[in-house]
Regions:
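Helix-loop junctions at membrane interfaces in 12-TM secondary transporters
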Residues: 60-70
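Intracellular juxtamembrane helix-capping segments at the cytosolic ends
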Residues: 80-93
């Protein structure tokens, strides 16, 4: 709705969404490879940073090439986040609990996306534009990053004690 409300055609809006989804495929593959190199949690953090930053750009970019670029960047990092959640769950729990951990990670990821859409729509209804909705999404991404960073510090501290 953001693009059609901004007077772009439905065909153009669908093209932007297609680019977002195609780069999501690339991001999923890339994040898997990156996770092999730097680890699952650092990959999750990097992809979350990208998603948190790029989501802010959508309501401010009003030219076609810019929308394709921001859609590509967001799709790339968004899908990297989703795959990194599952890899983190698998890497950080025993094999006995892996299925449950991945299911819970997926569940809360989907609940978060659903609530994000709900609150984004609610903010649009209250404010009458998309700016607050996308800022809220970025704020929630920042909260996620704070949690991930605390998790990272905790793991690092435990590794230092063991070493």
């Amino acid at each position: 709705p953001l693009l059609t409300d901004a007077s772009f055609s439905e065909d153009f809006a669908a093209s932007v969404f297609l680019v977002l989804m195609l780069f999501g495929i690339v991001g999923r593959i890339f994040s898997g490879k990156l996770g092999d190199i730097i680890g699952a949690l650092p990959t999750y953090i990097l992809m979350s940073i990208g998603q948190t930053i790029t989501v802010l750009g959508f309501p401010y970019i009003d030219f076609k090439i810019g929308l394709f670029i921001i859609a590509a960047a967001f799709g790339f990092t968004y899908s990297g986040v989703m795959s990194a959640i599952l890899v983190c769950a698998r890497m950080m729990v025993s094999a006995k609990l892996a299925g449950r951990a991945m299911a819970l990670g997926s569940f809360f990821g989907w609940v978060g996306m659903g609530l994000g859409g709900y609150f984004g729509g609610l903010l649009f209804d209250i404010k009458g534009d998309y700016t607050w909705s996308f800022q809220f999404a970025s704020l929630m991404g920042s909260v996620n990053l704070l949690i991930l960073w605390q998790f990272h510090l905790r793991i690092k501290a435990k590794q230092e004690v063991i070493a």
